[in-house]
């Protein structure tokens, strides 16, 4: 059907390209409908691996699609599926990818935003493997603009969860396996494009949600995603990964029991599914088939099976390569009964990868800045190695300065000499209150002088304020009354200080009360006493009874009673007896 559409529309497409601009608006709706059907036919041939590259036919189709996009009103009739099919068919072509790329860059993505959002929200479309392939190519290429519209991962995960449940009920369903495979690839590709914070959020959601817990294998089966999560280095994320790995192993062990029973491997040897589960928990790198084969070779003895895994002594007749794993890439060619051919939308050519410079589809590892340096390859000469601080070059100050540095220094010196003195603020009155106590030897006298000066200022300002409060307004700066006030204060305050005093006097009740009390009663600052603090001085007065020199010493304590003194005993030699000579 698609071959008939393409062959019959070749002449029509070439004629539509030569239609004059004045007649084009009447022909544009029919041309838009024709190009949509033609692109759909190209996509069907691409899926079946029967697309025959014809440079002239493809080029005419690209030019006609470009002309329809530039026509007002035709863009509304072109849907997101047609745009994605155009991308998948012609951007992967080895001959016309440059023309297709130029057309895709001109698509107004802002006008297509609502259509793409509405299309991706239809979750039933993602149960079709062909639609998942189409969106997968769209996600990898990102050709329209920097603002690319992706299907929401939150909408794709429930569909994948339902497909996994269907596969558990009917493991022999090849259609469900194919849909699950391509939908899983689409979700993994979207996760690759997401940020680190988004990736952690999806991991938490998969672990916390009971309905989506069976989709956790999407993260752990992709080595790049798993390594990316481990590289984040957060201890909480590592704990989440450990918890997710335990859940994933439980899922694998749960599937193993049903898989062993369905394949009938335990007919020869009675194998307990619990032993298979225990062996997989001990050795997570084993698949279900390998665990069953080790148990079969060990006659169901789990200890002997563990020993065979450690020593890798599996018999040749029980090689695991003869069995197929549970979740593998479905054989699409056998389902459609077609010869084995590479499906075009699944691989990007080198020319397309060169055009799409922002994303690389074959990037397996995350490279760093210092990955291919000399230190990594150990290509450092011994002359560059040193201990502690780098040794100083003794001939550094003997070297001549480059001419560029000399000219730059001379220019800076010339600019510094040519700069004139700035006398803008020389004529301004910079007088202000001066603390007369600074540098005085007597701090008490300086404090009293400052207090008297402040009292004089408060009294003067208070008197002027009682006579005419308008003198303190900002508008009265050039008035005669303000000039008299400044003369009275001997220009010790500025206009701003005078106006600020009035603002404090009217708003701060404590300050106003203190000023009134000081002016009225002259009490001044309560922190400073009315009398100066005197220092203690040694008196020269001597009592007359001490002048005659008859002063006697008065003991500090009474003398001891002589009768209470201890007796001193003197040790005497004993007298000799009379019979001793």
Curated annotation (Swiss-Prot):
<keyword id="KW-0963">Cytoplasm</keyword>
<dbReference type="GO" id="GO:0043130">
    <property type="term" value="F:ubiquitin binding"/>
</dbReference>
<protein>
    <recommendedName>
        <fullName>CUE domain-containing protein 3</fullName>
    </recommendedName>
</protein>
<dbReference type="GO" id="GO:0072344">
    <property type="term" value="P:rescue of stalled ribosome"/>
</dbReference>
<feature type="domain" description="CUE">
    <location>
        <begin position="271"/>
        <end position="314"/>
    </location>
</feature>
<keyword id="KW-0597">Phosphoprotein</keyword>
<comment type="subunit">
    <text>Component of the RQT (ribosome quality control trigger) complex.</text>
</comment>
<feature type="modified residue" description="Phosphotyrosine">
    <location>
        <position position="386"/>
    </location>
</feature>
<feature type="region of interest" description="Disordered">
    <location>
        <begin position="522"/>
        <end position="581"/>
    </location>
</feature>
<comment type="function">
    <text>Involved in activation of the ribosome quality control (RQC) pathway, a pathway that degrades nascent peptide chains during problematic translation. Specifically recognizes and binds RPS20/uS10 ubiquitinated by HEL2, promoting recruitment of the RQT (ribosome quality control trigger) complex on stalled ribosomes, followed by disassembly of stalled ribosomes.</text>
</comment>
<feature type="region of interest" description="Disordered">
    <location>
        <begin position="422"/>
        <end position="448"/>
    </location>
</feature>
<dbReference type="GO" id="GO:0005829">
    <property type="term" value="C:cytosol"/>
</dbReference>
<dbReference type="InterPro" id="IPR003892">
    <property type="entry name" value="CUE"/>
</dbReference>
<dbReference type="GO" id="GO:0180022">
    <property type="term" value="C:RQC-trigger complex"/>
</dbReference>
<dbReference type="Pfam" id="PF02845">
    <property type="entry name" value="CUE"/>
</dbReference>
<feature type="compositionally biased region" description="Basic residues">
    <location>
        <begin position="552"/>
        <end position="581"/>
    </location>
</feature>
<feature type="compositionally biased region" description="Polar residues">
    <location>
        <begin position="522"/>
        <end position="542"/>
    </location>
</feature>
<keyword id="KW-0833">Ubl conjugation pathway</keyword>
<keyword id="KW-0539">Nucleus</keyword>
<dbReference type="GO" id="GO:0005634">
    <property type="term" value="C:nucleus"/>
</dbReference>
